[in-house]
């Protein structure tokens, strides 16, 4: 995978993540992100992605896009939990790597933005044939990257320290008491699947794909440029 193919891979993920119709990044959300993104890869990029995938994925990137979530419970990968998010001081309208990118033990560089940079560089350096004493696990790098690009576009994975990314904001979702983070992660997609797509994930994916090429086609440039700079304050007691 050359640099141009790598850029195609990243752009495919980013293109999908600007879509307004996808709101939650649970297992189904991550599956949809990767399934749709695959369609925007060049043949060369897709070939190299499949080459890196573990055999059990059977050539399907979407099959491993929740791998990073499942991995966190493993003792050898507890450190990776902090890579799924980054929190800023409450009501700050900016992100500073030196201030915000760390885990609960104040280890620097452990946050989602640093993880995306790190695993992108691992993949890029390998395919640029840059000599390094470190032998990277490129399969893990690909699976981490495909997951973390999804996570960073879930708004509450880039949230405030005070409410732990919305986990402390209690809400009601169709009469079910939960927290705002969980609503964004899974419940919005779950509700949409049942209400509009008869619990058929492939049907929902197809609908989004059709909208990308049809209804939303002329809106892409607007998604890439956010001109409104507003500070939004969460309401600790909300009814949805």
What are these regions (language model features)?
Residues 2-8, 17-148, 155-240:
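N-terminal, motif-rich segments that launch catalysis or mediate targeting to/interaction with membranes
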């Amino acid at each position: 995978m050359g640099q141009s193919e790598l850029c195609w891979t990243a752009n495919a993920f980013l293109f999908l993540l600007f879509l307004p119709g996808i709101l939650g990044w649970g297992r189904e959300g991550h599956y949809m992100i990767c399934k749709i993104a695959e369609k925007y890869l060049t043949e060369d990029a897709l070939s190299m992605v499949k080459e890196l995938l573990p055999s059990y994925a059977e050539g399907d990137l979407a099959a491993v896009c929740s791998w990073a979530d499942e991995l966190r419970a493993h003792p050898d990968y507890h450190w990776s939990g902090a890579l799924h998010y980054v929190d800023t001081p409450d009501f700050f309208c900016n992100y500073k790597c030196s201030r915000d990118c760390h885990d609960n033990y104040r280890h620097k560089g452990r946050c989602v933005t640093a993880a995306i940079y790190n695993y992108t560089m691992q993949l890029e350096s390998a395919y640029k044939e840059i000599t390094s004493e470190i032998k990277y696990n490129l399969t893990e790098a690909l699976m981490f990257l495909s997951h973390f690009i999804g996570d960073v576009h879930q708004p509450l994975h880039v949230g405030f320290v005070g409410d732990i990314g919305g986990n402390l904001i209690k809400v009601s979702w169709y009469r079910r008491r939960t927290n705002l983070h969980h609503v964004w992660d899974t419940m919005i997609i779950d509700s949409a699947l049942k209400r509009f797509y008869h619990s058929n994930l492939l049907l929902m994916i197809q609908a989004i794909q059709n909208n990308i090429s049809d209804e939303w086609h002329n809106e892409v440039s607007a998604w890439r440029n956010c001109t409104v700079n507003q500070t939004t304050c969460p309401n600790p007691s909300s009814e949805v």
